[in-house]
Amino acid sequence: MRVRHIPGAKEQLKEYEFYIQDPSQYQNQWHLYFQNQHPIHLEVGLGKGQFLTTLAKVHKNINYLGLEKSQEVLLQALKKLDRQVSRQELSNMGLFHYNALDLNEVFGEGNIEKIYLNFSDPWPKERHKKRRLTHQGFLKIYRGLLSEQGEIQIKTDNKALFEFSLQQLKEENFHFVQVIYNLHNDGIKDPFMTEYEEKFVKAGKTIYKCIATV
């Protein structure tokens, strides 16, 4: 999906209280940002933010962080969140602009309990496969940041990406907890959905889901 350029997006991000301008300052000390020692869950590729916001509202004993590479996409998510709730009301959530390849600058070893990869760009061309967020290059980074028994959760509507992801996880010696080839038709209720997922389900699209541990 092509993202429309928004002039001044970088400066506009700073206007929102959920925006973390320099997340690297909290490496190994995210308790200073959240003011507690609760576990951290990270969504890589935030989109519009519905999934993470819903989780944060329900699970107040977990700290949720959302990473988005596109400043424009992040700005839209921040605007939407700002209309819904204040950080005082939802103090267990924060969003930041970063490249997932540089996550080691933001988190230390074992800092994250769970990583969510929801409807990531499939990068269908073979020459672009290293850009996929489930490529081995990214999985090696995630592994270093996940806590003992830490999890990766993947959801996608793209079968080719799902099968690629399973193979990459296997090659990196992750352990499969759950592999579902038709999430919403297997009688499994999943109340936490992204905006894309809601549209796909209404359109009758198949949703694939995987949970794997280190």
Swiss-Prot record:
Name of the protein this chain belongs to: tRNA (guanine-N(7)-)-methyltransferase
Amino-acid positions noted as binding S-adenosyl-L-methionine in the UniProt annotation, renumbered to this chain: E43, E68, N99, D121
Active site positions: D121
Enzyme Commission code: 2.1.1.33
Family annotation (SUPFAM superfamilies): S-adenosyl-L-methionine-dependent methyltransferases
Pfam family for this entry, one: Methyltransf_4
The UniProt record lists the keyword tRNA processing: yes
Top EC class of this enzyme: transferase
GO cellular component, one term: tRNA methyltransferase complex
HAMAP family: tRNA_methyltr_TrmB (MF_01057)
Physiological role: Catalyzes the formation of N(7)-methylguanine at position 46 (m7G46) in tRNA.
Key words of the record: Methyltransferase, S-adenosyl-L-methionine, Transferase, tRNA processing
Catalysed reactions, semicolon-separated: guanosine(46) in tRNA + S-adenosyl-L-methionine = N(7)-methylguanosine(46) in tRNA + S-adenosyl-L-homocysteine
Pathway recorded for this protein: tRNA modification; N(7)-methylguanine-tRNA biosynthesis
Organism of origin: Alkaliphilus metalliredigens (strain QYMF)
Gene of this entry: trmB
Alphabetical list of PROSITE patterns matching this protein: SAM_MT_TRMB
Presence of the UniProt keyword tRNA processing in the record: yes
An annotated Gene Ontology molecular function: tRNA (guanine(46)-N7)-methyltransferase activity
Signal sequence region: none
Residues noted as binding substrate in the record, renumbered to the chain: K125, D157, T194, E195, Y196, E197
Recorded family membership: Belongs to the class I-like SAM-binding methyltransferase superfamily. TrmB family.
